[in-house]
């Protein structure tokens, strides 16, 4: 990986994280029961990553080098900082486009359940250390 790509990911990721923070702060007073800001980040991020994937595939606006830079800055960087859920959603889309419906369903189930179990496990491991 080149230094330029690393910098692009870092710059994009920083701006994505700031955007996520701003959105969660802006929506914090709207709902106390659900994390509306994160929900919106996941939905908006998924919409944008789908649009960017199609745009970079279908248009010839950028040459291959520029397209790579745009992808690392905006998709890997910005959307990675804004939400990692968007990458998960793009992976599901790719599986569905290849006709791998059952693999996509399994991937969704395993990802969500394993992540939930990991969060619970991590939480209780640390809570056990501090008790």
Regions found by a protein language model. Name each.
Residues 1-131:
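Membrane-interface helix-loop junctions in multi-pass transporters/channels
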